[in-house]
Amino acid sequence: TLNDGVKRLQPGDSAVFAVVYQAVRNGETLLKVDPEKEYAGRINRVQSIMEHLTLVTPDTILNTAFEFAKLRVGESIYKTKNGLINSPGGLRYYAAIWANDQAEYTGPYFGYAGYGPGTEAATNAYDWFSGYMNNDFRPIPSSVIAEGTSFWNGAGDRGDQAMIAYGASRFALANGNRETAGKLWPLIEWCLEYCKRQINLDGVVDSDSDELEGRFPAGTANLCTSSLYYDALVSASHLCRASGRPPEVTRSYEIQASQIKEAINRYFGAKVEGFETYRYFRENDILRAWICIPLTVGIYERKAGTIDALFSPRLWTADGIATEAGDKTFWDRSTLYALRGVFAAGETDKALKHLSRYSERRLLGEHVPYPVEAYPEGDQRHLSAESGLYCRVFVEGLFGLRPTGFRSFTVSPQLPSGWNTMELKNIRAFG
C-alpha cells in the first residue's frame, strides 16, 4: 500500500492512497509504481476502446450493455512473449487462445472495432493457429496455450478448422488490409481443405465433437461445424475476388458452398418436438440451442419453425436459451448466436423482445454486468469472448453488416417497430 497510514481530514479535504499488486519472475525486483500515471494510463486505454463502434438506440439499457461488452472484450488483451493476445480471462484463462473464443467469436468483432491492440491480437491468434498446419492434414489443436508455446487438444477435432476458417475470413474482409489478408490466406485455405476432406457420404462435415467438448452429445457430424464451414466458403469466395485470385478458385468455393448448404438442409432438417427445425446430429430428437446457427449464416429455409422453437418454453429460460430442452444448463454463446440470427432473419420485434430481457438480466442482475460463459459450470464466469458476441448481435444482426470485400459490404438494418431511429457510429472497418 502506497501513502498508507493514519490521515486526519478536515471537511472538504481528501487523501489518496494506492493498493498495488505485482507479480514478477524469480530473481526480478518489484517495479517502482506511480499510481497517478497508472490511473491515467487506464483511463486512456478505456477511452481508446470506447471511442469507436458506438451504439445509439432509444433503449438506454441496450446502449449501456453494449458499452460494457465493448470494454470487456477490448480490455481482455494481454502482452505475451509472442505478442498481444485476446484471452477469455474471467479469473481463469490467460495467455492462451481457443478456436471458438478467439478465432470464431472475437476475431470478426475486432475487424469492426477499430481498436489497434484488438486488431493485433486477432492477427496474432490466427498466426498462432497457423503454426500447426501440416502436410498430413492432422487437425489444428483446439487451443494454443502458455503464451503460444504449447497446445491443448483433449476433445479431438471439435470442428476447429471450420471455426478458424469462418473467423479468419470474416476478420480479413472486415479489417480491409490486403497484406494482412494475404498472410491469413494460407490458414484459411488449409482449414477449408481440411473440412472438405471430412465430408461424409451424406455431404456434411464429420468431427469428433463440438465446442461443448462432449458435455452434450454431438454425434459424428453436427450442425455447427457444417454451418460454419458453409459460411467460411462464402467469405472465402469474397476474399478470393477481393484479392484477385483466379476466377476458377472463387467459383470452386461458391460451388462447394452451394453443395454444403443443400446438404445441411437435407441432412439436419427435421421435425423435432413438433417444430420444423433442425436436429443437431442424426440421432438427435430433443431440441438443442444450436439449431439457431443456420440463421446466423444466411440459411433461412426453416427459419419459422426454428425461431418458434428457440423462443418456446422448451428452450427459452430466464437466462436465455437452454443448451438442451428440459435441462438447466445454459451457455450464453448460443443465446447470443440465436439473437443475432433472429435479427438477421428479419424477425426484428421478436428478437428485440428477448434481447431486451436478456440484456436487462445481465446488466442489472445479481452477477457481473456482462454476458457470461455458462451455468452451472464455472458459475457464470465473465469470459471476454461472449462480450464480443454480444456486440456482434447489433453489428451483424440488428444492422445486418456483412463484409463482401476489402472496401465493400452488404447492410440490412432491422429497425424495430417501436423505434424511430437507431445508429451504429464510428465503425472502423474496411481499412
Predicted regions and their residues:
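Proline-centered turn/helix-capping motifs that create local helix->coil transitions or kinks
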Residues: 77-80, 133-138, 196-206, 266-273, ...
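Terminal accessory carbohydrate-recognition/targeting modules of carbohydrate-active enzymes
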Residues: 1-61, 115, 347-351, 355, ...
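Substrate-binding cleft and catalytic face of glycoside hydrolase catalytic domains
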Residues: 169, 189, 198
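Helix-capping and short linker residues that terminate individual alpha-solenoid repeat units
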Residues: 130, 134, 176, 196, ...
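Substrate-binding groove/exosite segments of carbohydrate-active enzymes
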Residues: 47-182, 209, 283-296, 310, ...
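The feature captures the catalytic groove of carbohydrate-active enzymes
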Residues: 2-35, 91-95, 141-163, 193-258, ...
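Gly/Pro-rich turn-and-neighbor structural signature
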Residues: 55-68, 250-272
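Active-site core of glycosidic bond-cleaving carbohydrate-active enzymes
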Residues: 98-127, 182, 186-193, 214, ...
